[in-house]
């Protein structure tokens, strides 16, 4: 008779032994088992798990073999946004970052980590067991790729401690694995990947995890998201991550002055040239984690870190043509067509030139020979014109005077660099607005691709976003269009119907309000759970919009201008009548009228239980308007330890003053 207890113990012992061997081999580069010994133990475990699947552990190393096939990836909201980093393309910009921190803090240090050229990922563990892995996605929502990540040898399926935590890192493909993969694809007559990053990105989104397992992806982990697990410094955090079993890039350096930082970066730049994986710079972080909250963040990136980009290699090409693209706002963007050339591993045939002033400053002309590189190792850019090769009949490039779409005269405001087509009936502007409205981060109607939208626009089926939701009334017309059968049309209508339930942040972004990108939309929907409340507050109490951290005057005025336009209000009304929700999917943070509603509040001194940003957020959620300076219009002064001159001024102006204890009581009132 089979002893099931012994079988269960054997499976557990083999699992632990093999996981330990994986850690020794892939993370510590110090294998204790030979390949033959490892393979024999793995084969034994596979046989036992097949016969007794009830004893298979959720962190079994057999998961790294793959075999699970997804139909599609589900989308999951990140616990906290996966933000991008601001860039420094030279030492001057890096020095500006350093000086900004040095003005605020007399003593701090920095950690410089290699910026791995890969794919950002978030890993979540429960009681030390990996249970979820997400791509970065748009920073707020990511795709679940757990089965694929389980196949990566360096990812611990079980930590050395039974912790609940979330970590973030970068998945990458080594250069040697990339070359091997492309050799295999060449033999199989499959398209080759242009560079290791694209190969890693394409691999991690494979629906079949067996394919992922074969491609030998790697990973480095660099941060913990759980505040209660944070150490005092980033340096200590990296050491802690390594102790949990994570693969941490060993090439990080600490510095306490800008001069020292410069030296460390030079060392890292020299070192990375001999590595078997690609990097595109160094991430400089303030080492002391307790300073991060005070330093703050923008809607897009933390202010306590910056990505310093290494200089990239140049490739030579020739300017063939300069064309102008019309955006949804009417702004014209010049694009340079060049003879296709390989730049940092990918073929480049077009380079964005930003604006006409940029063309003049660089003196870019037709038929010029130019040096092309990738700014930040990502965006193709003309680094310089090779004037020694310029043709003798060359002439400076002359700005066009008419819109390339509608031929209206262009407009340029005094003091600005951009040219605009101000014809609101410009067809290209309307098409670009529709393309933006259906885009992934807006309404995400993926069945309405650019060409389909243009076809429907030319057929006069769609002119404004609201017309998209009337397509179902034109079923017969749609099915008569060449290439649009009943099934394709039904797929479009299904996607359109589904989009009606998109969150307010997506709809706001889709409306294309000037200065209101996805990040700003997300900030606004944390404070307003419907378009009606946002509109009413914008028109009646603009100061409360301005006082929201990360919004400010420019965005507030842009919102005001948008909601004052009757055509915009008419379009919003149509969209609502056609079923678009305009509601936040998160719980409303707007409170019922209370003590703080519409009160102008000023803060002074240090609070014991709140940081300045925390208390500002709480007060704004209560409906308060936060001001920096006291005036006769101020309703309330909140004081903490070591208040400044504002306290005496408030007494002189007879402004109500409350301390932290009373503040907490008022905040807790319903």
Swiss-Prot record:
Annotated GO MF terms: DNA ligase (NAD+) activity; metal ion binding
| PROSITE patterns in UniProt | BRCT, DNA_LIGASE_N1
* Cofactor(s) essential for the protein: Mg(2+); Mn(2+)
Q: What Gene Ontology terms for biological process does this UniProt record contain? A: DNA repair; DNA replication
Catalytic activity as recorded in UniProt = NAD(+) + (deoxyribonucleotide)n-3'-hydroxyl + 5'-phospho-(deoxyribonucleotide)m = (deoxyribonucleotide)n+m + AMP + beta-nicotinamide D-nucleotide
Q: Where does Zn(2+) bind?
A: 403, 406, 421, 426
Any matching Pfam family: DNA_ligase_ZBD
Domain BRCT: residue ranges? 591-670
Q: Which InterPro entries match?
A: BRCT_dom, BRCT_dom_sf, DisA/LigA_HHH, DNA_ligase, DNA_ligase_AS, DNAligase_adenylation, DNAligase_N, NA-bd_OB-fold
Q: Which residues bind NAD(+)?
A: 35-39, 84-85, 113, 136, 170, 285, 309
- Give the EC number(s) under which this enzyme is classified: 6.5.1.2
SUPFAM superfamilies (alphabetical)? BRCT domain, DNA ligase/mRNA capping enzyme, catalytic domain, Nucleic acid-binding proteins, RuvA domain 2-like
Q: List the PANTHER family hit by this protein, alphabetically.
A: CHROMOSOME TRANSMISSION FIDELITY FACTOR 18 (PTHR23389), DNA LIGASE (PTHR23389:SF9)
> What name does the UniProt record give this protein?
DNA ligase
Organism for this UniProt entry: Phytoplasma australiense
> What gene is this protein a product of?
ligA
